[in-house]
């Protein structure tokens, strides 16, 4: 209710309410303040406010979500507002509001089923309720993972848990979720690589923080290779198709050179875990962890190609 909170600005995604999971690329995107969002959220339907970006959407038939908002990437006003109320030290975590991520949305807003590739997740529910469906990493084969849309550090499921289709994804019927409803004051610990689908049951505000684990360096190396492959393939497609491969959070297609630099960094960290990533270059001659040729040789090794063919054949059944 404070003027400082009402003036906070960010990007929101909006979509009609419905019974199926919505991908981010299928949403409307708009820039608005928290105050404009709250005026719309409290309305009974449409609002008569030409200056409010939400005015063209009927509140009764649409949801809105400001999700995955890293406080460090927002204006300093966000950190100033959250700093007095968000802290993780009581959980033995040396992080604060500036390290957190904000999720604010109306009932029906949701995040598709996905798996974070590194870190464990701590989630604090500040307002409203959220439903979480969690699946063990052992369920991965039943959830039909995909990297399209591509988002760094996220592996999505092709299964729509809101409207599952066992005829297309028969193994999904065997998946056993753990359902949790978070209420204000609750904190949820999401173990590494656990799949999760999240839906707001009311207008909801939550914050989370990811905590590094000792084996994250290996997962970052895998993510770097995934980015190289996606960059290489998407770059050879038409601009429209290539963009369709990317989640909106990615911003655009990286160049192959940029992706290789990230891979170089990731593998160098595997060699030297305590190395300050700001203190070395990305040129292979600067003690690089691998050469581009070595990467090509690894990806095209006969045993790797055999596994790829086997996976492709399984996907046709």
Residue ranges and their predicted role:
Residues 1-187, 195-317:
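N-terminal accessory scaffold of Fe(II)-dependent oxygenases
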